[in-house]
Amino acid sequence: MRRPTITIDASHTLGSGKNTGIERVVRNLCRELPSVLQERGCPGLQIATHFQSRFLEVDPGLEQSLQFLSAWERNAGEFVPGWIQSIPKWIAASSHSAKLRKWMEPRPSHLGIYKLPHHVVRWGSLTRKALEGNAIEPSADRILILPDAYWTRRDIWKTVEAHRKAGTMIATVVYDLIPLTHPAYVGKKRSDKFQSYLDQVVRNSDTILAISKTVRDDVKQYIEAQTDRSAMCQDVRAFVLGAELSVPESETTGQSIRSVVKNLFNASSPYPPYLMVASFDPRKNHTQALDAFDLLWQSNPELQICFAGRSGSRCDDFMRRIEQHPKLNRGLWVFHDLTDMELHHVYEHCSGVLLPSIVEGFGLPIVESLWHGRKTFASDTPIHREVGGRCCEYFPLHDPMTLAKQIQAWELMRTAGSTKGGIKAAVDWSQPTTWRQSATQLLDAVLDSFSQRVSMPQVRAA
C-alpha cells in the first residue's frame, strides 16, 4: 500500500494563548506524530494553518510568528506600552459596565481592546507566507487530520470541502456534543453554531475520531437520527487521549515556573492546595468544589484549594463569588494562565485533584492527575467512570457534603503518612495512556481507513 503524506491542521492552537484541554491535545499530537510516522514508514508530518481559503505549511519562521501571537494573547498587557494601557484602564475605572471593563482590561487569554492590532499582525505574518508559496495542495496521497476547535473557525470548511473533492482524505477529531446535548450550558447562539459545525464535520469527513467511546456512540446516534445520512461519514472510531504534560525533563525544575506557583505548591508544605483544572464554565461545576471547601473550612481552616483555568462564558456570578470570598489568596487561589510546566508542577505537589464536572467528552485532567499519581476525586458520571475506571474516588453530583467528607477522610490518611507510595501503590492503579500511544492509535486508525479507501474507492458527493 502506498504511504500517504499526513498533514495536521493546528490553526486555532498555533496562534492561541489558551491552554485548555483542546490546545494540549493538538500540541501533543503534533509533538508525537513525527516519530510514529517514521516507525510506520510514512513521509514526515506537515503541520498546517488555515488562511484565506488555503492551508499553509508551518515552517520555522511562521511557527515563530505564531508563538509570538500566542504569547500576546496569553497576556495582552505585557505587549502593550504602559502609556497606551493607561487610556483603557482609565475608561474601565470610570465605567459602570462590566462588559466594557472586561473589554478594556482583558483577563489572561483574552485580547479585549487589543484584538484589532493582534489580528493585523497575524494577517501580515500569514499573508507573507502565502505569497512565499507555502500553500499545501490537495492530493489523493494525503490525509488531512483536523483536531482543532473548528466551531471557532467556520471559514475552514469550504477549503476542507475543496481538498476532499480533489482526493484528500479528511479525518476529524470530535471532542464532545455537549452544546447539542446540554444547550443550557452554552446558550442558543453557541448551540446553533455548534450544530452548524457538526453538520460540516459529518458531511466533510471520511473518518471521525472521537476522544472516547461515549463520544463515539453519541456521534453515531446523531448520524443515525438524520434523514439524509447516506451523505454523511459512516466511519466513526474512538481513540484514547494521553496523560503526560509536554514538559522536557530538563525543564521541570527550570526558571519558567513563577515564584508564586512554586511557593504555593511547595513539597515541604504540610497542606498544599487541592487542585481543580478546568475552564470557568457552569458545566465544570466549580460551585460544588467551592461549596465543599466552605464546609471543610469550618473545621479545617488550614486546607486550601486552587482553581486553574481560563475565564469562560456564563461564569460572572461565580467569579464575583470568588472575588468577594474571605479566603481569597488565603486558602482560595485562582490562576488563569498556567503554562504546561506550571501545570506539571502543581499536579506533582497538590494534595489531590477534583473533577466535579456535570458533563464531559473525556475529562483530560483525570488522566493527567493519575499520571502524576495524585488522589483523584471525580463526579460519578459515565464518562468519568470510562476514563478513570477504579483509580478515582467518585462522588454524587450536587452533593458537596459527600465530597467534603471524602476529602476529610483522605486528609486524615495523608497527614498521618498512611498514603506512602501514593495511589500508584494501590492494587487498582494502572498506567494511563501516553501521548505517544494516543498518537499511534490515531495514526493507525486513519491509515486503516485510508487503506480501505484505496482498496474500495468511494464515490463522493458532489
Q: What is each stretch, according to the model?
A:
Residues 1-462:
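Carbohydrate transferase catalytic cores enriched for Leloir-type hexosyltransferases
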